[in-house]
Amino acid sequence: IIKQKGFVASLEVFPPKNDLNIDTAIPLLDELSTLKPDFISVTCGAGGTIQSDNTAKLCAHIKENYDTEPVAHFTCITSTKQQVADRLALLKEKGIENVLALRGDRPIEGLSISPEYTYAKELIKEIKAEDFCVAAACYPESHIDCGDLDAEIEHTKQKVEAGASFLISQLSFSSDIFLNYLSKLRNAGVDAPFLAGIMPILSKAQVERMIYMCGVSLPGNIVRILAKYQDNKEDLEKAGIEYACSQIETLKKEGVDGIHIYTMNKPHIAKALMQAARQ
């Protein structure tokens, strides 16, 4: 899916969480498709059947209706090998050819961790054997469960060796962190295309959630933006989008392969950041 076509710009959306009817997401996809992203990825929950079905349904809708390739997120932390095989068969049935293979977040109450998968690399190997194009996640500030950047680099290298064709990174608010991580990847012999994950800050609560969930750090520029605009939602969002656009411009200038925009299902964010990517 990642061809030699210059700077890659892709979008991420999430499906309806508890509703088998995907119609509510169609207007969003209609709008995003006009931005001509290189692909649109669709998230899924950790083991939720409805979410997995909706991921497949939205990917099929993208495939059938737009000139854009879909990428289905695929987690394994609560899955048996049979469940993985069944979900892959469903994706094949719907003509989906691209998958982002993830271990997945630790499950909520009521779901148990599968003993059949410990690492994403195991899932990647299985999916690759079924003739899918596989993307892997990577973590410029290390995975929150790992904490060691050298170990994270080694895990990422193993994912590529298992069959991942390209890498999509977790968000970071620091371009320097992205570039340092990419340099370490290349020095470790990992030459797969790298897409930097970009998410603009929209609120203080959102930033706090990202720190808690992902362990991201806050560069001084972000701290100053939050301090200046935390009492004005509109101005904070505007400043957050401008900052994200400046990140994209820096990364593009420094030769990063591309960016992956976490749209949060907000078309105006996707539009602003795609414009920065295409300049």
Write out the residue ranges for each language-model feature:
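Glycine-rich anion/phosphate-binding loops
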Residues: 76-90, 117
